[in-house]
C-alpha cells in the first residue's frame, strides 16, 4: 500500500520533469537548426537537373522495415519511373537494403546518424554531396521528420520541388518550421493509422500506386528452407528505459518458460548495454546468448526460423512480423497505434501486452488517447512474467512440454496470414 501511494506521488513529478526536458530539447533543436542552416550558406549554388529524385529515409531499422515494401512503388509509378532515383539512407539498415532492396533505386547515399549529429565536418560532407548531385525533387516520406536530419538534408539538396508528410512531432513550432520547407504536403486522414498503413497511403498519394500486401513482408535471399524449430528469441533491450522490460522480469519469464516447454531460449540485442543485460540474464538462466555477435542479416535468418519472438517495442518486433513469425510485444504504450497495435491494424500473428496503468487510461479516454506519451520505467516493469508466459502460450497454441507443429514435421509455419 505504501509503495503504491509513493508511486502515485512520484508519477506527476516524473512526468512534469520529462515535459520540461522535452521543451528544453525543442528549444535546443530549433537553435541548432538555425545555426546549421547558416553553415549551409557555404555550399555552392544549386544546379538541379531534370528528373533526378532524392528519397530521404534516415530513421532507424524498425521504421525502415515498415517502409521498405513501399519503396519500389516509386520506380514502378508513371510519375517517377523515368527519374534517376537516389535513396538517402541510414547506414544502420544498409545490410538489409543491399540484400533485399537494392534494385528499388538507382543510387544510394549512406549516412552514419551518430557521426552526422556529432561531427560538423562529416555533416558538411554529406550536405556538399547532396548539393553536388543536383536533385530536381526531394521526397521525405517519414511521418515524424527530424529537423536536423531530413529537413536540413532537404535544404542541402536545394531541389526545385519538395514533397513530404505533414510533420507530427509533439512541438507545433517544430512542425510549422519543418512543413514550410515543402511545396506538397500529405495530410493523413487517420492520425491513428499503424505505421505500415501510413507508409502505404503515402506511397499511393505520392506515386499513384500502392503496395498490394496487407502486412510487412521480408523475403531473405538464400533463406534456409528448414522449417521453424522449437527455439524462441528474446530481444531484451530498447533504446529508452521506459520501453525496457527489466532483466529481473526476463529472468523470471525464462525460468518459468523452461519449466514448461522444450527448446532453447535465445537472447538477442545490439548495444553494449543490451549485451551486458543479456550476459546477466544468461548467467541466471543458462539461456543462449547471441547479443552483439551476429550481423543484422544473420539475425533476420535466425528470426525466420524461430518458434516465436518476444521483444520490447523495438525494431525486432517489425523484423519478426515482416518474417511472419508469432510475435509477442511487451510495450509501454507510447505511440502504441503506430507501432505496437498490430491486431487493430488487421495484421495477424502478433500479441501485445501493456501495463495496467496504460490499459486503464485507454479505457477511460478511447477517443483522445492515440498520442500517449506518459509512460514511466515503472509502468513496463509492472507487467508480470506470468502474464507474458500465458499470452505467449495462447499465441503459439502450445501446451506445456509440447513441441511446436513445425518440429513435429507439419507443413505449416504458424503465425499470421
Task: Outline where the language-model segments fall.
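Catalytic machinery of carbohydrate-active enzymes
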Residues: 1-417
Amino acid at each position: 500500500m505504501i509503495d503504491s501511494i509513493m508511486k502515485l506521488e512520484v508519477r506527476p513529478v516524473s512526468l512534469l520533469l520529462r515535459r520540461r526536458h522535452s521543451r528544453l530539447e525543442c528549444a535546443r533543436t530549433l537553435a541548432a537548426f538555425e545555426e546549421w542552416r547558416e553553415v549551409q550558406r557555404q555550399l555552392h549554388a544549386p544546379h538541379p537537373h531534370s528528373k533526378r529524385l532524392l528519397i530521404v529515409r534516415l530513421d532507424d531499422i524498425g521504421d525502415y522495415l515498415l517502409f521498405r515494401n513501399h519503396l519500389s512503388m516509386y520506380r514502378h509509378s508513371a510519375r517517377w519511373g523515368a527519374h534517376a532515383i537516389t535513396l538517402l539512407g541510414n547506414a544502420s539498415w544498409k545490410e538489409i537494403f543491399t540484400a533485399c532492396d537494392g534494385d528499388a533505386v538507382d543510387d544510394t547515399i549512406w549516412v552514419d546518424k551518430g557521426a552526422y549529429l556529432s561531427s560538423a565536418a562529416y555533416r558538411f560532407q554529406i550536405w556538399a554531396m547532396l548539393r553536388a548531385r543536383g536533385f530536381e525533387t526531394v521526397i521525405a516520406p517519414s511521418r515524424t521528420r527530424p529537423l536536423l536530419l531530413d529537413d536540413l538534408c532537404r535544404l542541402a539538396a536545394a531541389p526545385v520541388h519538395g514533397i513530404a508528410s505533414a510533420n507530427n512531432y509533439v512541438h507545433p513550432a517544430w512542425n510549422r518550421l519543418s512543413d514550410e520547407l515543402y511545396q506538397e504536403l500529405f495530410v493523413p486522414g487517420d492520425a491513428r493509422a499503424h505505421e505500415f498503413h501510413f507508409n502505404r497511403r503515402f506511397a499511393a498519394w505520392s506515386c499513384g500506386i500502392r503496395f498490394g500486401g496487407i502486412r510487412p513482408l521480408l523475403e531473405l535471399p538464400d533463406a534456409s528452407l528448414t522449417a521453424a524449430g522449437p527455439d524462441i528469441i528474446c530481444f531484451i533491450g530498447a533504446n529508452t528505459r521506459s520501453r525496457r522490460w527489466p532483466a529481473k522480469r526476463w529472468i523470471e519469464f525464462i525460468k518459468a518458460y523452461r519449466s514448461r516447454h522444450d527448446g532453447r531460449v535465445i537472447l538477442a540485442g545490439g548495444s553494449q548495454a543490451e549485451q551486458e543485460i543479456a550476459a546477466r540474464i544468461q548467467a541466471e538462466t543458462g539461456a543462449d546468448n547471441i547479443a552483439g555477435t551476429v550481423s543484422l542479416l544473420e539475425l533476420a535468418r535466425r528470426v525466420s526460423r524461430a518458434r516465436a519472438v518476444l521483444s520490447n517495442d523495438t525494431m525486432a518486433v517489425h523484423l519478426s512480423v515482416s518474417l511472419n513469425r508469432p510475435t509477442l510485444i511487451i510495450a509501454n504504450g507510447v505511440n502504441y497505434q503506430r507501432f505496437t497495435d498490430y491486431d487493430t491494424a488487421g495484421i495477424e500473428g502478433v500479441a501485445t501486452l501493456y501495463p495496467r496503468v496504460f490499459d486503464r487510461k485507454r479505457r477511460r479516454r478511447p477517443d483522445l488517447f492515440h498520442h500517449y506519451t506518459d509512460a514511466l520505467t515503472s509502468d513496463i516493469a509492472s507487467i508480470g512474467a506470468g502474464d507474458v508466459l500465458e499470452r505467449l502460450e495462447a499465441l503459439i497454441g502450445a501446451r506445456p512440454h509440447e513441441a511446436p507443429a513445425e518440429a513435429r514435421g507439419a507443413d505449416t509455419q504458424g503465425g499470421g496470414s
